[in-house]
Amino acid sequence: MTDTIADIVDLDRYPIADLAAPETQALVAEAKAKLADPGYFTMPGFIRAEVVEAVAAEAGTLLADGHWHERLRESGIGLATGNYPWHRPTRAAVRCAGGDRMAANSALRQIYAWQPLTDFLGTVFGVMPYYSSADRMVGCMLTGYAPGDELGWHFDPNDGVVTLMLQKAGGGGIFEFAPKVRGGEGAVEVYDAVMDGRWPGTVSEDQDAGTLALFNGHRSLHRVTPIDAAPDRIVLVLSYDSKPGQVFSDDIRRNFFGRTS
């Protein structure tokens, strides 16, 4: 694909190339406010509707040769409980494809390489200068969830997660999060209530294809519900850092892709 960024991103709706523009400053202010509470901000239609189907097809082709892995994990929950004698594993089942498999002129890679997006995100997160990851595998990667797959309840090791929804699942695949529940008095009871569906503060978000989402998940317990029906849920995950040249460990690469290079 050789489209310009203006053909891919709806710059009329989101004029983020000009950070000084009043519309962009208003968008930044809104994003900062929503990331502060509840910790989640979306930009529906960030990718033009006429482009979404093509990028989803490209992603689906790459994921067909991707690496599927399933695991039960406790660390994301356990770390948040301190010394509480509490363990409740959650399941993660997902297929991943590395950015190094994307063509140089891929629209997916064009989005990630577009400096105004990086600058906009850094401004929103309050981290400037801000850099896209130098890791060609993990920095710009695809995740695919087929029927039966899911991303169980967990906390992120850091805030500032950036994702782009390329294709909604035919059923299930809803993003759910419980804002700011990490730690504190009675944490275990809160976690159990969230995971049992009894917590009144849980938020459900059903993103449409083309939506850019920003999320602070370090203190918010969150998950993607099991996929119930085709088509697959396909998401582009974008990584950034406050320092240039950031790369991920071989263990992380192996976990995602079953390979290190």
PLM ranges: what are they?
Residues 28, 114-118, 159, 217:
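A structural signal for well-ordered alpha-helical scaffolds and beta->alpha junctions
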Residues 59, 166, 240-242:
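Short beta-strand segments enriched in hydrophobic/aromatic residues
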Residues 175-180, 184-261:
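Catalytic core of Fe(II)/2-oxoglutarate
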Residues 63-67, 125, 244:
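A generic secondary-structure signal for well-formed alpha-helical elements
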Residues 102-104, 109, 118-212:
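Catalytic core of non-heme Fe(II) oxygenases with the double-stranded beta-helix
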Residues 48, 158, 171, 229-230:
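Short strand-connecting beta-turns/loops that link adjacent beta-strands
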Residues 2-26, 36, 45-116:
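Non-heme Fe(II)-dependent double-stranded beta-helix
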